[in-house]
Amino acid sequence: MIASANAASRATIHAYFTAFNSGDIAGMLACLAPDVAHHVNEGQVRHGVEKFAEFCAHMSASYSETLKDLVIFVAEDGERAAAEFVVHGRYLATDP
């Protein structure tokens, strides 16, 4: 059971980053729990999928980013995970 929880968490995280790299916001949102808490560096915490969707729409208008060299770390029980990556991108518009 633990191995399947680990694999399920890893698959969800991989699906999220695949959607991110494809610019598929709906696919990203499908990977999130309804009560997601998005902690932005140098910003306030956004709570809920709707707030995260608003953030994604804003970012898509200002930036084009791809995440490369992705490494996913998952606890054995699947309850905690982290990802490491390198961001490659460009500015599309001045961020207000």
Predicted feature locations:
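C-terminal and inter-domain tail/linker signature
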Residues: 1-96
